Amino acid sequence: SVNRGMTQVLSATGSERNVILLGAGSEESIERSEVHLEAETLARTIGGLEQHLGQTAVSGEIHYMAPLTLADASSAQARLRGVTERALLVHPNVRVLAGRFPNPGEVMVGRLAHHKLDAPEPILALGKPLRFGNVEFTIVGHFEAPGTVMESEVWFDRNDLATLTQRDSLSCVVARLGEAEFEDVAALTFRRTDMELAAITESGYYARLASFYRPIRAMTWLTAALVAAGAVFGGLNTLYAAFASRIREMGTLQAIGFDRPALLASLIQESVLATLTGTLLATIAGVFLLDGFTIPFSVGTFTLSITPKVLIVGIGSGLLLGLLGALPPAIRCLRPPHPPPHTA
């Protein structure tokens, strides 16, 4: 569920219709990218981009990571985005839930930003102050962008963020395709080599970002495997002790005519039934306690979702572990020789 949530939020953030213009060499880190302000104007001249009420869907943005000081004086690392209202043209999944878009001296926070900041939700209520450096801002809006990392961001007026970060450039320019193709936007990077630009689809950028977290996902599977191995060995110890006291009982049953395969199946059924009980209890606890739980990570937050597929994998793994843990003790219990059964 952790791996699925992390992968889903990164894949959902990127759109195939959005093309990002970055500084050459910064294709894997938008925060390190520097793009000249003129690139935004040039991008608007590309034909075939999406139009809204006569405005071309092009947004120059500043992305930055920095600590923010909240109303309760606590400080936490946050993901900041400096934007203009044109950002809504290229990110149509962003919807203002309450308040309005920020003006200078104001910010708009994502629906899940309090999880990223490890703060109670009321701290980011409308009208609350928020400090970046020595400058105080007022929260004037809340927004959502379902299933994306943007929901954990804090959006500033672009000029404010440029001033505070002392930069005269953008991090990127995002262009939304209409009839145009990716190659039409990429052609700008070849025409203006002096600007040292690189073009990448937004989905491609976040796919690269997802590959960066592949070792973390591998560690998640490794941790699960270690926990499973511990459960198997713990079960082996328990069942060896439980079945050892039943060797005489098994011998008696064999002596009166029950064969070993039938007794082996009986012992395994007992073990699997006990395992299934524990698995179902753990599944119920997971559904009620973890489903919808939000976890912060470096680029945002993701939400755990206990889907039917996750439930099937969990229950199936529990039954498999019960089977593996029962076989060796059951075979050992039935191994001692016994006299031939009596016949009438």
Task: Please identify what each model-predicted range represents.
Residues T13, E50, T69-S75, F101, ...:
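Mechanotransmission and gating elements of multispan inner-membrane complexes involved in transport
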